[in-house]
From Swiss-Prot:
Its main location: cytoplasm. Its EC number is 2.1.1.170. The keyword Transferase applies. One of its GO terms (cellular component) is cytosol. Keywords: Cytoplasm, Methyltransferase, rRNA processing, S-adenosyl-L-methionine, Transferase. The lineage of its organism: Bacteria, Pseudomonadati, Pseudomonadota, Alphaproteobacteria, Hyphomicrobiales. The gene is rsmG. This is Ribosomal RNA small subunit methyltransferase G.
Length: 205
């Protein structure tokens, strides 16, 4: 099996397939993603989320903000299971969604844990990390503000944020408050979308 050109082992494929079944079951009673995107679960959500691991395929410690339906946090945690290293801290304050995330991690033997707390309280509970991810959560300025407790003054901590076609405007707005190094990774799944890699964060105002 391949996802965006990434060769996926039989074991990881099985984990992803089991996650997809769990997701479809829980999505009947909990609003995990926009209902209009459920039919495109593999392409729109799983393949899209797997790009995070393709960009950073190392056994590092992640914080996934506003994990919701598990994208990209659970997908990253599933890939880390094959590496037998690294960890994903999934932050989700909605307790029903947090229950789904715990079930998904447990049943796929993925490498992660769930923190059912507000993002603003997460850094005190989780501590340092190497990477931060978020998808469909907030504009770039908001994501950087959420990530600042981990990233400010930490040269080795990077943020990886999925963004749509309006990303250039979001970058310009964020640069009004922050200085940062930026790499734009073109999406292999969604045309005109990117994953923004942020590092060396400094506050301007």
């Amino acid at each position: 099996m391949e996802l965006n050109g990434l060769r996926v082992s039989r074991e990881t494929q099985g984990r992803l397939q089991h996650f997809a079944l769990l997701f479809q079951k829980w999505a009947k009673t909990i609003n995990l993603v926009a209902p209009s995107t459920l039919d495109a679960l593999w392409h729109r959500h799983i393949a899209d989320s797997s790009q995070i691991f393709q960009i950073c395929p190392r056994p590092v410690t992640w914080v996934d903000l506003g994990s919701g339906g598990g994208f990209p946090g659970v997908i990253t945690a599933i890939f880390l299971a094959e590496l037998q290293g690294g960890w994903v801290h999934l932050v989700e304050s909605n307790h029903k969604k947090a229950a789904f995330l715990r079930t998904a991690l447990r049943e796929t033997n993925a490498r992660g844990s769930v923190h059912a707390i507000r993002i603003e309280d997460a850094s005190a509970e989780i501590g340092d990390c190497d990477a931060i991810s978020a998808r469909a959560l907030a504009d770039l300025d908001g994501l950087i503000a959420y990530s600042a407790p981990w990233m400010l003054g930490k040269e080795n901590c990077r943020g990886f944020f999925h963004k749509g076609r309006d990303y250039l405007r979001e970058i310009a707005e964020a640069r009004g408050r922050w200085e940062f190094d930026l790499i734009e990774h073109e999406s292999a799944v969604e045309q005109e979308s990117v994953i923004l890699e942020i590092s060396n964060l400094r506050r301007l105002v």
